[in-house]
Structure formats: C-alpha cells, structure tokens
Amino acid sequence: MAQDVLTDLTKVRNIGIMAHIDAGKTTTTERILFYTGISYKIGEVHDGAATMDWMEQEQERGITITSAATTCFWNDNQINIIDTPGHVDFTVEVERSLRVLDGAVAVFDGKEGVEPQSEQVWRQADKYDVPRICFVNKMDKLGADFYFSVQTMKDRLGANVVPIQLPIGSEGDFEGVVDLVEMKAKVWRGETKLGEKYDTVEIPADLQEKAEEYRTAMIEAVAETDDELMEKYLGGEELTIEEIKSGLRKLTITSAGYPVLCGSAFKNKGVQPMLDAVIDYLPNPLDVPAAEGHVPGKEDEIISRKPSADEPFSGLAFKVATHPFFGKLTYVRVYSGKVDSGSQVVNSTKGKKERLGKLFQMHSNKENPVESASAGHIYAVIGLKDTTTGDTLCDPNQQIVLESMTFPDPVIEVAIEPKTKSDQEKLGTAIQKLAEEDPTFKVHLDQETGQTVIGGMGELHLDILVDRMRREFKVEANVGKPQVAYRETIRRKVEKVEYTHKKQTGGSGQFAKVLIDLEPFTGEDGATYEFENKVTGGRIPREYIPSVDAGAQDAMQYGVLAGYPLVNVKVTLLDGAFHEVDSSEMAFKVAGSQVLKKAAQSAQPVILEPIMAVEVTTPEDYMGDVIGDLNSRRGQIQAMEERSGARVVKAQVPLSEMFGYVGDLRSKTQGRANYSMVFDSYAEVPANVSKEIIAKATGQ
C-alpha cells in the first residue's frame, strides 16, 4: 500500500495542525494518530504522555515547542502531519511548517473562538496561501458555543467560513454532529470509551430547521464555485453529494472559503469525520502550484519544478533537530524528482555539495527507514553537514534555489556565563547545535563585558533554550536578567560625509578616502539596510567597493548612541580616492566603518524599542485596574470588547515595561485575568527614557 502512495500523489496530504496555545491541538493530533492506527495508546497532554510532544520540556509544560513530522494512513490515503506550536514565542516553528504544507486544520477552542495567537497563525497561513479547514474543538467544555466561534472567525479573521457540520448538544451533553453534506447525524454513544465507533442516524427533530438553514448557506457557497452548479441550483435542482463535495474541495483549495467542523478531541468525538474532511477537501501535492525558485546566482531568472518523479530532484530543508542517537536530523519537503539514500546532492543556497545519509519517515520521534525520497513527501535525513533551515537541496546538474522563509530578529536577550572552564566548552557546542535548529535564536559577544549574550522571541523561548543547554548538553551556567533588544536608527538624511583613512608607519602605509550619503530606509520584506554604489570613472577600484559595504555593516553592529545595532539605513557611496601602493581592502573597510559612524552622529540618531501587542482578558470588576496599570506602563489602549462574559483589553505596550507583568496582573485581579502578547513593531523611545537607556549603556 505504501508503494502506491509514493507514485499516486492524489492519495497524499501534507497538513499542519495550527491553533492557539490551549485550543487542544496536540490532543487533536494524538487522536488522529490513534484512529489511523499508529498510536496504540492515546497520549494525554494532561499527564505529559503525548506522542507528538517528544522533548522533555514539552511534556512537562504541556505545550508543543518543535513541530514533529508524522506519517499516518487513513482509508488508503497517506497523511503527513506537522504539529506546530501555538505559543507566540515559537512563531518560527509555525512559519517554517506553513512554508512546506499543502493544507492545514485550524483548531479553535469552542468557548474562546478566535484568540490572539490563532489570529496571528491565520495571518501567517494567509501569507503562504495555505488552504484550511476549521475544527471547533472542546465542544464538551462549559461555555462552549459553536455559533459564537464561527461568528468570531468572520469578525476577527474576515474569513468566508462555511459550516459543514452543526453540533448535537453542547457542554456535558455534546454527543455528536449533524453532517450537512449527507444530511445525517453522527452520534457517539457512551458504550465505546475510545470513540472508535459512531452511529449514523436521522437528524434530531429540534435541529432539522437549523440544519436546513445552514445547508442552504453551504450549497450557495458551493454553487458559486462553478457555473454549471449555479445553474442547477437556481433551476431548483438538488445537488448530489459528489457535486457538493467537489464544490467544497474547489472552494477550499482556492482559499475562497473554509469548511468548519466541530467535535471534542479529548472526549473522542468528531475526529474521524474531520479526517474524512482532510482527504475530501484539502489539496494533494498535485493540486498546489509548481514550486518556484531561481537559478543560483541569478535571482531574476525564475524556474519551477512540478511534483513529479520525472522532474529533477529538489527539496527544502525546513527544520533541523538534534536526535539522541543520530545527531543532526534535517527535515526535508521534497518538491520534485526522486533521490536514493546515499546520493550526492547540492545545497544550492550555500553552493555546497552534500551526501544524503539515511532517509526516514518519522512518527513523532520514532523513525521508519526508507530507501528513497520522492516528490510530494516529507522525510528526515541524516548526514547533512552544512544544511540549515530554509536551504534548498537539489540535483547537482539542474540546480534551483527555492523560495526560503523570513525570520524575525530577537526582541529579548540574556547574558549567560558558564560556571567552569569545561562548561565554557560545552556552552560553545550547545549554542552551535541550538542555533542550527532555531533561526530565531541569536548569539553574540558583548564587547564591553566579554559575556555571551543569547537572544530569542520571548521569556519562555529563552527559558526553554537555557533549560535544554542544562539537560541535553549538561552546561551549568549563570543566567542574567532578561534585557530588551533595543535598536538605533536615524531620522534625517545627511549628504556628502567624507572620511579619509591614512596611516604611515614606515614601509607601505594605508590609504582610503570615501564620500557617502546616509538616509533613513525601510525596504521590502523587512530589509533594514541597503548599499548603493554611485562611484564613476574608477575613482575607487571595483574590487574595493564591497570592502566599503562590509565596513559600513560592521559599524552598524554598534550604534553611536548606546551601542545597539543600527537599522533602517541606506548608504550611497558617491566618490573617493585611492593610492596605487597604500590602498587595500582592509583600508577601505576601515574607511567604510568610520564614515558610517561619522555620518550617523549627525543624522539625528534615535533609539527604538520593541512594542508588544498585548491582550488582557479580565472580569468586568477589574477593568479599571487593568487599564490603569497598562497606562502606567506607557501602554496605549487600542480597543475594548466583550468576549464570553469577560472584558478584553487590547493595547500596545513597550516590552521593557512588561517584565514581571504576570505576577502584577494576578495580584490585581486575584488570579482571574490572563494575558497574551506578541511582538508588533519597533518604535522610537520617548526622550526621557532614551536618556536613561544611554546612561545605563555608557555607564554615565
């Protein structure tokens, strides 16, 4: 059977399960694995036994951090699932899994509806145009409301959602779903504890009218996908079940609409029909457009690869993980062609040869060896030395560089000091391995203190990285207080700033003269720097131009106000001079570095700080205290709304003011409020705060 699936890609689905942190995503994935026959015992997140959560920290914290890739089978179809984390600190995991998926199941909490993180993940899925079906989970929970959840999808996501099921009963009485396509009820009765059996019965009389109303809306949405169906519908003819399913499939694959289902993964209700919907409505690798990329070194020469075994091999490495026995495991989505284990391929992103060691299809962290990798599938590879997240692997004779991913810079940093000399060595290894796995984990040496500083996307992110250093790499280290990752930028353009680097110490000297303009700049795709060369007539030899650029970029690592990285600037090299004997790449690099510092000082430099989008959910009684507290933290209230009987306050608050917020919020609201925050943008710091930051950084 597995062999058929390799050749018949219509029977393959590469999907992700995406959601807010507590919507029940891992539990849903566990149930899928159970019903498809791979897991023999259902793993519960509550007792830390979930199959997909395979790192110790994940099992302890009950959250998913790394997206494990798992293969399972359902009705002769193969489903490759990537479980993505829902916590905001791990957006990188979500971002990279969405890049390699063909479709996704968005899981929502039946009581909360669309939450801040679900909104963020939904937007990321929009960015990569991933078709989705929605699963409203936790229908057994007190306060669960399917219709409210569907309304929040319309209001907050602006999504054209099409319910194809309705719940039967709710909260403790939730017992099944109305299938609007077949107009039957599917009911899970109490006898089968694990919910593997359900009965298909007539729709309960009290739901008949509502089912008719929602079915009409569904059929109208389906009819709009196809002129023939529209004619049939307007002519008063009934659409067949096959026509409805093919219309829903078209609606989903073109992202024109999103079918909505419901259930309770924890209570084992509604999971099998959701698996049927994955097969019926989500795309197979042949339904999605051919993978596009460019010829190495020629970014404007676009080429594509179809998902066929006859095409040249190409694949994208989307995750690197450290395995206890095999060392480095690289997860690869194969987009075209076929390649055997042991083959030589090229990492076209880096221009390096690689040999594929063993190939596996993974079940969470158990591995199933295979002989070859073919288009449309996801594999784990051992033996790749230089390949990191976002790199393309391809046929050495027909190379392509596939579109990669963009990762945000860290917003929070901590200094880390090894306790002993042997810890120092272990720390080096740990940092290298963790940085390979996680592109949002950044490291640098503080030039003033000589300390190693690590940066990440939030406090939880750094906690887990430090925890992994201790557990996996046995590094004992002291960790400093979290620090905000400030940036510096400039406000105005300065023109014709000149610098001459001259050194004469016997023998050959050093000489380089440069003239630049420096101006504020924000590029597409979040680029924060641009260098333009306008030198004419050989005033600076061509081979020295890149050195000026490199020198300017070096100087940007440490800004002129408080030593924070300088961003959002454009350097235009206008003119200069050189000396036949004394000029060198090094001399022009120094000149490039010094001229940038000189220009930045007169370009009205300012400090930027990370601003977080904060959402606090609180009972009405504490509303005044919560708003007062956010205002005292330099917060700007953006909106207030009601949700499930509580009040929700949305605000933008500087990250520097949010340390320790969780404790303050608990004490102000007697533990009844909760909050979430995601990075929003960088903004200029007020003058009084700027003075404090500069004084602290320069020790004045």
UniProtKB/Swiss-Prot annotation:
Residues binding GTP: 19-26, 83-87, 137-140
SMART domains from the entry?
EFG_C, EFG_IV
Q: Name one GO molecular function term.
A: GTP binding
Location of the protein in the cell: Cytoplasm
Sorted alphabetically, which PANTHER family does this protein's record hold? RIBOSOME-RELEASING FACTOR 2, MITOCHONDRIAL, TRANSLATION ELONGATION FACTOR G-RELATED
- Which function does this protein serve? Catalyzes the GTP-dependent ribosomal translocation step during translation elongation. During this step, the ribosome changes from the pre-translocational (PRE) to the post-translocational (POST) state as the newly formed A-site-bound peptidyl-tRNA and P-site-bound deacylated tRNA move to the P and E sites, respectively. Catalyzes the coordinated movement of the two tRNA molecules, the mRNA and conformational changes in the ribosome.
UniProt protein name: Elongation factor G
Natural source organism: Mycolicibacterium vanbaalenii (strain DSM 7251 / JCM 13017 / BCRC 16820 / KCTC 9966 / NRRL B-24157 / PYR-1) (Mycobacterium vanbaalenii)
The uppermost taxa in this organism's lineage are: Bacteria, Bacillati, Actinomycetota, Actinomycetes, Mycobacteriales
